[in-house]
């Protein structure tokens, strides 16, 4: 391989990496405490491909009368598999989360009846697809204390915040972008923030208008 060809390959690789910028987002609650499992979505104005795509399938387990994980992040069109590991039945319902729950119609959601697991038998499971962006509130008609969430996004750049309330994207295309935050306890979504992704790490802070609920153990 000639020197010129090697140089050309190196130049192409450099140009590809040069267009990937870092955006760091911090989410805190009304009291200034870090919020885990908030969903952060970045919508760049430039076209690109995320190097960390979301999985098109996710499993949500019902165990000890809880949804595990409590917050599931998927792309629009993803398949959700609900698995009942409890020995009693669950009647799972999904409906719009946030303010959307007050104007939702009968067709704006789904219901799944899952029999309890029998000793020595495989757990019962059912699938459902998520075809609209936004938050979905999960509950159970039989056990009113059960509460979980699904968030479907149409942007490839999306992730949940860590226990420290942070979400760091290292592959955002250079240029302007809009950043949105969704959190399960927030009735109305926070206003989006504009950011310019480039050579310097872009840092944004979002503060909720509520105190995040603690997950029931």
Model region roles, listed by residue range:
Residues 1-4:
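N-terminal secretory signal peptides that target proteins for export/translocation
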Residues 6-15:
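Bacterial N-terminal signal peptides
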Residues 20-217:
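Extracytoplasmic copper-binding redox domains, predominantly the cupredoxin/blue-copper superfamily
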């Amino acid at each position: 391989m000639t020197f010129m060809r090697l140089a050309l390959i190196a130049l192409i690789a450099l140009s590809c990496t040069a267009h990937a910028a870092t955006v760091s987002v911090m989410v805190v609650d009304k009291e200034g405490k870090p919020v885990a499992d908030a969903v952060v979505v970045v919508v760049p104005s430039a076209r690109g491909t995320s190097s960390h795509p979301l999985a098109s399938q996710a499993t949500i387990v019902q165990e000890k009368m809880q949804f595990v994980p409590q917050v599931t992040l998927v792309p629009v069109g993803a398949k959700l598999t609900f698995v009942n590991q409890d020995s009693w039945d669950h009647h799972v319902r999904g409906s719009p989360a946030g303010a959307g729950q007050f104007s939702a119609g009968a067709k704006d959601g789904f219901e799944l009846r899952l029999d309890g697991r029998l000793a020595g038998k495989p757990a019962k499971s059912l699938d459902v697809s998520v075809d609209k962006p936004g938050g979905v509130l999960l509950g159970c008609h039989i056990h009113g204390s059960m509460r979980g969430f699904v968030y479907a996004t149409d942007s490839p750049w999306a992730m949940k915040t860590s226990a420290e309330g942070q979400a760091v994207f290292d592959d955002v295309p250079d240029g302007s972008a809009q950043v949105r935050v969704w959190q399960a306890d927030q009735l109305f979504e926070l206003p989006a923030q504009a950011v310019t992704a480039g050579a310097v790490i872009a840092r944004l802070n979002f503060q909720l208008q509520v105190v995040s609920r603690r997950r029931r153990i």
